[in-house]
Amino acid sequence: MFDHPYLAMYQRLHEEFGLKVQLNLFYRMEDFDLSQVSEAYYDEWEANSDWLKLSFHSKLENVKPYESSDYDEVYEDCKRVHEQIKRFASSAALANTTTIHYCSLTEDGLKAMEDNRVFGLLGLFGSNQNPRTSYGIEESNAEKIRNGEI
């Protein structure tokens, strides 16, 4: 598995500096989906799961996929990716945090993530000069996040 240049780089950085990596996965891209991923590297994924994690990102790479999605859509898309990760890489390789594509979810989508045992959402909050907010967080709280207050 570490013959792949990106994974080899991550492994080298882990060995040299203790780097920990989380890869956020789309379920489908053009003519490929996660159900086609081989189980041949299962043992390697599991053996490296202390520093190399996989997580749900989105069903497809499209513009703001969950900005107005209901509970069922988000729940099923996340569940499908989680099932595939467990199949080809082990439960140990499944992260309990993620970054949703475009950092946007409805309240129902947030509940769907929690029900899929995702307990941390990583977002984009920008800087004080170029502020951003994620997951519908109020700007006042986003500012506190940027300043390290929460």
Describe the residue ranges of each PLM region.
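Glycine-centered loop/turn motif at secondary-structure junctions
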Residues: G18, S49, E114-R117
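Alpha-helical scaffolding within the catalytic cores
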Residues: D3-M9, D33-E46, E83, Y135-I150
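Active-site-adjacent pocket scaffolds in enzyme catalytic domains
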Residues: D31-F32, A92, Y102-I150
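Metal-dependent polysaccharide deacetylase catalytic core of the NodB/CE4 family, i.e.
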Residues: K20-D108, Q129-T133
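N-terminal regions that are enriched for targeting/export leaders
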Residues: M1-E15, L19
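Generic structural signal for hydrophobic
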Residues: L13-H14, W45, M113
